[in-house]
Amino acid sequence: MSIILGIDPGSRVTGYGVIRQTGRHLEYLGSGAIRTQVEDLPTRLKRIYAGVTEIITQFQPDMFAIEQVFMAKNADSALKLGQARGTAIVAAVNHDLPVFEYAARLVKQTVVGIGSADKVQVQEMVTRILKLSDKPQTDAADALAIAITHAHSIQHSLHIANSVKMTETQEKMTALLKTRYSRGRFRLKI
């Protein structure tokens, strides 16, 4: 069982979503947005840090997943986004959480099945996947999608690890049987 905190960073609105993963089962724990209405960037970053810290304290997540920076048309916007993202990551690291990063395109591909999905499609699929009665706000839905992507990544990694272990076990058994058969310990009955 793991509790995953997903973050959709923004300098004005930072979405968050928290889920619990038990095997393949995902359970919604909470979501929302940290809104920073002040004008100066340092105060916004301070509020993002405080907000993420409060969420970590409240939900006690085991893992922290965040969207990677994408290339924006406006360099100033990209820099502010990077600073907001860094602030959220520092809050996670200060609580000894492992940090995982996912590209927006991968998140959309994982949750919707299309890497170019829009916010409404992501919102709809998050609502279905987590069996929510109401649609979360778009920033929270994006953060939940990031958490879902991380949960999917964990499942995929476990599947691969189990496959590797199974292959190694099969190889060891085959080698053992070949050794014993060649020594005459086993006889094939036909």
Swiss-Prot record:
CDD domains: RuvC. GO terms for cellular component: cytoplasm; Holliday junction resolvase complex. It comes from Haemophilus influenzae (strain PittEE). It is an enzyme of class 3 (hydrolase). This is Crossover junction endodeoxyribonuclease RuvC. One of its GO terms (biological process) is DNA recombination. InterPro entries: RNaseH-like_sf, RNaseH_sf, X-over_junc_endoDNase_Mg_BS, X-over_junc_endoDNase_RuvC. Pfam families: RuvC. Binds 2 Mg(2+) ion per subunit. Belongs to the RuvC family. Mg(2+) 2 binds at E67. Mg(2+) 1 binds at D8, D139. Homodimer which binds Holliday junction (HJ) DNA. The HJ becomes 2-fold symmetrical on binding to RuvC with unstacked arms; it has a different conformation from HJ DNA in complex with RuvA. In the full resolvosome a probable DNA-RuvA(4)-RuvB(12)-RuvC(2) complex forms which resolves the HJ. The active site is at D8, E67, D139. Its EC number is 3.1.21.10. Its cofactor is Mg(2+). Its main location: cytoplasm. GO terms for molecular function: crossover junction DNA endonuclease activity; DNA binding; magnesium ion binding. It catalyses: Endonucleolytic cleavage at a junction such as a reciprocal single-stranded crossover between two homologous DNA duplexes (Holliday junction).
